[in-house]
Amino acid sequence: MKINRKWTNKRVQWGHPIGEHETIAGKQAKIASDTFAMDAVWKVASTMADNKHFDIRLEAAIAKLFNTVAHYELLQQTLQIRGGRGFETADSLRARGEEGIAIERLLRDSRVNLMVEGSSEIMHLFIAREALDFHLQHIGALFKPGVSLGGKIVAFLKMMKVYALWYPTLWIPVLSASQFGMDNRLNRHMRTVARISKKMSRTLFHKMAIHQKKMAEKQLLINRFVEIGTELFIMSAACSYADSLKADGPNAANAVELADYYCKEATIRIKKLFSDIGRNNDAATLKLNHRFMQGEFEWLEDEIAKS
């Protein structure tokens, strides 16, 4: 943030500091709010870990997934804002009398975090497995090979007993935002989190009812649910963190503003994810990949310019 703040005030194009141009302004607003969200996530997850009474496997996975992806994207945008200077080494910049900020090196160092200690793809699968665990516990017996008809009937009756109590609660609206006891803006976002959580659970249940045991193979579909769940956790963490900073005087207003902005942007992304769950191009994607793996597009490889 400091690198961008100093540079976008110093660098002038078309008569204005580049930070005043809307294209850069959009990037910097995201950098600021995402940095706050990253800070919130690791602090919330760390606090839960220190408590020793929480099973934080899911929260830790979400924190790893979000923070590594967000950090890499932040550096990508910083590189873009710095322009050609972003590719220079620190020594090269200092030799020209400028501050030695090696953004491209930071970007390369950050990139490895998307692959080690659980790649982003593995994190998606782990989070999905945790999210589906409730359903797998209750419907798994229906699809186990070798289970007798009587066993499946018993499993079905047990499943119906559980879902008859659980499913109706997903349709109960969240009426009051004040119950969260935060700033009004944060309360509204927490109400949104509660409302969308119910919608996500309903939608996931409906998709599982449609795809049944094949649901585990629908990774493109599942990943959208993972992204929604991740966004909801980050929104909750951002609101909680902003609320905890109330005692810090002037930082409190800034914290609420940052959390408010992040949550508004996250809500827009969530709406798009729900839309993609309902209508997507997954079948064509898988078909095209199959043709790719069969070598049907080798002619594109032959058209590459050779030195």
Question: Whereabouts are the PLM-identified features?
Answer:
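Flavin-dependent oxidoreductase catalytic core characteristic
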Residues: 1-307
